[in-house]
Amino acid sequence: MLNRRETYLVVGLYVVLSAAFCWPFFAQPLASGSGDWDVHLFYYAAVLRNAAFGDLPFWNPWYCGGNVLWANPQASVVSPVYLLSLVMPIALAMKLNVLGHYVIGCLGMHLVVRRVIGVQSTAVAVYLASLFVFAGAITLHVRSGHTVFLPVFLLPWMVYCFWLATAGSTRALLCGSAILAVIVLNGGMHVLPFAVVLLGVLGLGALAAGRIKPLLLAVAMIVLGCAYAAPKIAPAVLFVRGGDINDTRPVKDPDYMSTEMLRISLFDGSQTTRVKVSPGVQLYGWHEYGNYLGWFGGVLALASAGWILAFGRDDWRAVAAAVGLVMVLAIAAGEFAAFAPASVMRQLPFFSSFRVPSRYMMLVPLVGAMTVAFAARALEAARGGSAWRRAIEVLCVVAVCEIGLVNRQHLREIFIVPADTQSRLFERTPPVIAPHPVVTPGPRVHRTFMLDSMLAGISPLNCYEPLQVKKVAVPGPVEIRGEGDVTLSASTFSPNRVAATAVVGRDPGRAVLNQNFAQGWSSSAGAVERDPSSGQPSVVLPAGYSGTIAFTFVPPGLWIGVAVSIAAIGLSIVVWRR
C-alpha cells in the first residue's frame, strides 16, 4: 500500500507522462482539429447550445434539418467539457478533457497492476499502465477525432472493481456498474460492447479455470450498469432499431485482419504512412486496425499468456487474463471464417450494430498488460536478488519512452484549423435550414464544417452524420407554417419546442413544422403525424381553433429508462447499506 507521499508522486508521474504524450494538442491550444474532430466537437457544442436556451439536449435543430441528440449514440450527456467550456474555448476544453482521460486511464491501470495483481516494481507497473494507455489503437482514433472512444480509459477502473467483486466486495460490484453507466453517459455507447466483451472474456476465462462466480458477477455488473444508464440507452436503442433512421454507414464484409495486417498492427509504428494491405482484404484505413505495442510489449504479452496457460494455472485470475487475451485477439481478427467469434457476434442483436470488429484491438493492450502483470508477479515471488530486477526496470523505462514516442507522432499536425468564435457558442438564435454547410477559410484538410455551420446559424441538409433521421425538412427558417385556412403569429423557438399562435377559419387546417420527422414529436393541439405532402411533423387543427400550438420533442423511451434507473439506484442503495 502506498503512503500519501508515494501516491502524490505516482499521480504526478502519470500527469507528466500524459501531458508529454498529448503535448502536440497544445502546440496551438485554441486550434481545432482536422478529420472528425469538427463533428465530434459539434456534438458537445449542440448540447451547450441547447442549454443556452434552457433545454435539455433532446433535439438538434442545427443538424441535417433536425436530428436526434439525446438518442444519438455518439452524443455525450455527461462530460467535463461542458463545465470547462464555460470559462474557455470549446476546442481547448476538449483537449483538456482528452488529457484528463489519459491520466485517469493511467491511474486505473496502475491500481489494477499494483493493488489487485500485486506487482511490486513501480517501473514495471508504470510500463504496463503505459502499454495500455499509450497504445496505438486508441491513439489513432483520438487522432481521427473519435472522442466516443475516450471512455475506453475508464475500463481499467471497471476491471478493478470487477476483481474486487470476485473477492467478495458487493460495494465494488455496485461501483463497477456505476463506472459502466458513466462510460455510456460520457458518449461511450461505442465502448459498451467493449465493456461487455472485456468482462465476458474474463468471466469465461475464469470458467475455464473452474470458477463460475466471476462470470455471474460479470453479467450482474453489466446488467446493473445498463440499468443505471437506461435513460440514455433506451432512447438510443429505440432510435437505432426504429423506422425513422437513415443509416448511411457502409457495410463491408467480410471484415478481417490477415496475418500481415496483424503483424503491422501490433509491431509496426508507421501505420499512418502506410497504404492498405492486399486490396480487397483491408477494407478501412489503419485507424481501424492499427495498435502498435512494440516488439517488447507484444511478444511479452503473448509469451506471458503462453507461460500462464502452461505453467501458471495456480491463480485462476491469471488464467482468466490469459484466456481473455487469446479470446480478444480472436475477436479482433474479424470475420476470417464462418465460425469466427466476430462472425458469430454479428448475428447477435446487441453486437450486430458494432460493425468493425478490429476495434476490439483496443482491449488487447489492457488484457495483455494484466497478463504480463500476473507473470511479473510470479517472477518477483520466485527469484531473489536485485540485479535482475534493476535490469528489467531499466528495460521498462526504455519501453515506456519507446511506445510513447512512436505513438505520439500520430498526434502531430492535427490541430491546425483556426479557432472558432467562442462568443457565438451560446447565441440564442433559431437556425436556418440550408442545402449545404458553411465553408470557412482554413487549411485544405478533411473537415465536416458542422460546427462552423452551427455557429453561423445554419442547419445544413448535406451533413456529415451516419445515423440521422430521414430528411424531409426544406431550406428555410425553422418555424411552423399553416396549410388551409390557418393564420399563424407570435412564433417562438427553442431546440426542443417551437410554438406559434394559430387561428383557424371555418374549415379544418394543418400546422406543419419545418423539421425532420421522428418519433417523439408531440403537440399541444393533438397527435403529431407526418404531413401527407412533405412528411414533416404536423397536426390537424379543427375549424375555429384559436390558441397557442407548440411542437415539443422528447426522445421515446426516456421516461421508461428513468424509471428503470431509479429502481436500480434504489435497489443499490438498499444493498450498499446492508
Model-identified regions with their sequence ranges:
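Transmembrane helical bundles and short interhelical boundary loops of multi-pass, membrane-embedded
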Residues: S32, F336-V344, A378, A382, ...
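Start-transfer (signal-anchor) and selected internal transmembrane alpha helices
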Residues: M1-W23, L217, I222, L309-A310, ...
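Membrane-embedded helix bundles of polyisoprenyl
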Residues: Y14, I104-V116, S121-L207, A218-A236, ...
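Periplasmic/ER-lumenal interhelical loops and adjacent helix-loop junctions
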Residues: L41-A51, D55-P57, G225-W307, F426-V469, ...
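Hydrophobic, aromatic-rich transmembrane alpha-helices
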Residues: A227, G294-A330, G570-R577
